[in-house]
């Protein structure tokens, strides 16, 4: 049962802490706050932390999962080795996904995240909890976000010398799809609301979740390249 747990893990820097604190006060169960791990590097760090807390050896599990992930990753590279996979990325997600997604895209794929938008309505204290690793922009409206993207990265108007961010990938919700189309960018819906793709039993957390995300991102690129 829940009161017998040895540790509670809150996968959010802004949501769930109050509940975990009350649970600790009532049942004596400590808690930690961690970002949702996506992909091997983040999941390695997470499992190592948890294993050390309980005197366990996570190394065999980590090594096995890394072999699986990078095995698929390496074999998949043969299918698109002639593609340009050095992308710029803009993320538009809720507060729980913003930092984990940016970590995965930069660390595992080597892409450059130019903008990370957080769509939650947050207090100043909650915004501060998210600060530090990546520069975040807090905007809640679809048009507000679209204007910010176009202002930060205006399209070329035929200038000979133009610092353009291409190829560009917008990773957000279905609401950003039109903005992506208008800029000739790739797009993948991963954050609420999603109504341009069917998701029944797929998540992006952990090792296998990282593979799912890699598959979805690169699948979009290959479908466009044809």
Name each region found by the language model.
Residues 1-226:
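An N-terminal assembly and electron-transfer interface module characteristic of large anaerobic redox
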